[in-house]
């Protein structure tokens, strides 16, 4: 355990950020699962709507530093390919 006040504060801040990031990461994963579930059922409109929501969450996560921008782009690309496969 830290003895110096600034180190104690940093430990507190790190824990708060860890919990916040955990929540945001969970939100991101849930939004992606909604898209995959809609694709699995074959509902194109619902999949499209879920995809739009997932893109927002992924972009927000990338901008906040929860995930890397390339990882967000990769997820969006793969989800979009699955949604497009329903259309044609």
UniProtKB/Swiss-Prot annotation:
Family, similarity comment: Belongs to the bacterial ribosomal protein bS20 family.
Protein name: Small ribosomal subunit protein bS20
Top-level taxon of origin: Bacteria
Taxonomic placement: Bacteria, Pseudomonadati, Pseudomonadota, Gammaproteobacteria, Chromatiales
Biological role stated in the UniProt entry: Binds directly to 16S ribosomal RNA.
Pfam families in the cross-refs: Ribosomal_S20p
GO cellular component, one term: cytosol
Example GO biological process: translation
HAMAP family the record matches: Ribosomal_bS20
Presence of the UniProt keyword Oxidoreductase in the record: no
SUPFAM superfamilies: Ribosomal protein S20 (SSF46992)
Compositional bias (Basic and acidic residues): 12-30
Chain positions covered by the region annotation Disordered: 1-32
Organism field: Halorhodospira halophila (strain DSM 244 / SL1) (Ectothiorhodospira halophila (strain DSM 244 / SL1))
Ranges that cross the membrane: none
Key words, A-Z: Ribonucleoprotein, Ribosomal protein, RNA-binding, rRNA-binding
GO MF entry, a single one: structural constituent of ribosome
